[in-house]
Amino acid sequence: MKYIATFYSHFGAIRFKREAPEGVTNIELRPVQRDLSSSCGTSASFDASESFTFTEDSTEEIEQIVAITEGGYKIIYESPNK
Protein backbone atom coordinates (compact mmCIF):
# COMPACT_ATOMS: atom_id res chain seq x y z
CA MET A 1 0.00 0.00 0.00
CA LYS A 2 1.18 3.55 -0.72
CA TYR A 3 1.52 6.19 1.98
CA ILE A 4 2.56 9.85 2.16
CA ALA A 5 4.20 11.51 5.16
CA THR A 6 4.41 15.29 5.57
CA PHE A 7 6.88 17.07 7.83
CA TYR A 8 7.50 20.27 9.77
CA SER A 9 10.97 20.70 8.24
CA HIS A 10 13.12 19.52 5.33
CA PHE A 11 15.49 18.00 7.89
CA GLY A 12 12.61 15.86 9.20
CA ALA A 13 11.90 14.53 5.71
CA ILE A 14 15.55 13.64 5.14
CA ARG A 15 15.78 12.04 8.56
CA PHE A 16 12.67 9.94 7.86
CA LYS A 17 14.25 8.62 4.68
CA ARG A 18 17.52 7.85 6.46
CA GLU A 19 15.93 6.33 9.59
CA ALA A 20 12.76 4.78 8.15
CA PRO A 21 10.38 2.95 10.49
CA GLU A 22 10.34 -0.84 10.29
CA GLY A 23 8.39 -2.15 7.29
CA VAL A 24 8.74 1.06 5.24
CA THR A 25 10.26 0.64 1.76
CA ASN A 26 10.72 2.57 -1.51
CA ILE A 27 10.88 6.03 0.09
CA GLU A 28 10.86 8.96 -2.34
CA LEU A 29 11.11 12.58 -1.22
CA ARG A 30 8.96 14.91 -3.31
CA PRO A 31 6.98 18.15 -3.13
CA VAL A 32 3.81 18.00 -1.03
CA GLN A 33 0.62 17.66 -3.04
CA ARG A 34 -1.70 20.65 -2.79
CA ASP A 35 -4.48 18.79 -1.02
CA LEU A 36 -2.03 17.83 1.77
CA SER A 37 -0.75 21.07 3.25
CA SER A 38 2.63 20.99 4.95
CA SER A 39 4.88 23.40 6.78
CA CYS A 40 8.01 22.58 4.81
CA GLY A 41 6.76 21.61 1.35
CA THR A 42 8.56 18.24 1.28
CA SER A 43 6.82 14.90 1.66
CA ALA A 44 7.88 11.26 1.61
CA SER A 45 6.01 8.77 -0.52
CA PHE A 46 6.58 5.18 0.58
CA ASP A 47 5.30 1.60 0.53
CA ALA A 48 4.27 -0.44 3.58
CA SER A 49 1.82 -3.22 4.35
CA GLU A 50 -1.89 -2.50 4.78
CA SER A 51 -1.47 -3.25 8.48
CA PHE A 52 1.15 -0.47 8.84
CA THR A 53 0.63 1.63 11.96
CA PHE A 54 2.55 4.57 13.34
CA THR A 55 1.79 5.67 16.87
CA GLU A 56 4.72 7.74 18.11
CA ASP A 57 7.13 10.17 16.47
CA SER A 58 10.17 10.43 18.72
CA THR A 59 11.68 13.06 16.41
CA GLU A 60 8.57 15.31 16.52
CA GLU A 61 9.19 16.10 12.83
CA ILE A 62 6.26 14.26 11.22
CA GLU A 63 3.16 16.38 10.64
CA GLN A 64 0.98 13.53 9.36
CA ILE A 65 0.99 10.18 7.56
CA VAL A 66 -1.83 9.28 5.19
CA ALA A 67 -2.68 6.14 3.25
CA ILE A 68 -3.55 6.67 -0.40
CA THR A 69 -7.02 5.21 -1.04
CA GLU A 70 -9.33 5.11 -4.06
CA GLY A 71 -11.38 7.94 -2.56
CA GLY A 72 -8.45 10.12 -1.53
CA TYR A 73 -6.53 9.85 1.73
CA LYS A 74 -7.00 8.15 5.09
CA ILE A 75 -5.10 9.64 8.04
CA ILE A 76 -2.89 7.02 9.73
CA TYR A 77 -1.02 9.39 12.06
CA GLU A 78 -1.47 13.04 12.95
CA SER A 79 0.94 14.95 15.16
CA PRO A 80 -0.51 16.16 18.45
CA ASN A 81 1.30 19.46 17.69
CA LYS A 82 -0.66 20.04 14.47
State where each predicted segment sits:
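Amphipathic, hydrophobic secondary-structure cores in small proteins
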Residues: 1, 26-47
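A short beta-strand micro-motif
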Residues: 4-6
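Helix N-cap motif at beta-to-alpha junctions
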Residues: 9-12, 45-51
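Short amphipathic alpha-helix segments
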Residues: 10-26
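Short acidic, gly/pro-rich beta-turn/loop elements at beta-sheet edges
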Residues: 15, 39, 54
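A generic structural signal for short, non-catalytic loop/turn and secondary-structure boundary residues
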Residues: 22, 37, 58-61
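C-terminal structural segments of small proteins and small subunits
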Residues: 48-82
